[in-house]
Amino acid sequence: MSLKVLVIPEDPTYNGAILEPLIKRMLAECGKPQAKVLVLTDPKVNGFDHACARMVSIAERYAHFDFLLFLPDNDGQNRAVGLRRLEERVAQSGVRLLCCAAIEEVETWLLAGHRSKLQQDWRQVRQDVSVKENVFTPFLEQFGNRKESSGGRRRLMKEALRNYHSVTQLCPEIGDLEGRIKAGFAEIGT
């Protein structure tokens, strides 16, 4: 039986194009290269608050998945306590929800694999709460492709993942999520 993982982004079109290849690679690194990864599009959520408000109903609808991963932007907030509570609330229905907020935005994870192309110090990129507007948008204009459905995000993320271990070092929350997924494998016996 193949492992099934649902990725819940704040935006399935653009963030989903970054997160799907990342989670596939992460699961391969965890020894699950055949895992099925689905990005949530139904119901389509729009932003952090909307996703949180719908999470219990999403969990009920997708309870047949082995893991649900909610991967929002941190947006300069300290989301850890709220995300932990959300995990606990969903766990009451027997569903495994793991949350991981991208510091500061999901686009940062893509940028980590292209650090040599950036014109800024990496610490500044990581600390910029408007990294999408200040760093990622100019990067995408230069290296993306408007003709691609995701503007080039999927391709750029796949390129970034050639340096997966560097990405996990530059964005330690990704490594933490990987560790939590491995621990979850032990719980479900895979």
Enumerate the language-model features and the residues they cover.
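C-terminal accessory helical subdomains adjacent to catalytic cores in phosphodiester-
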Residues: 1-5, 13-190
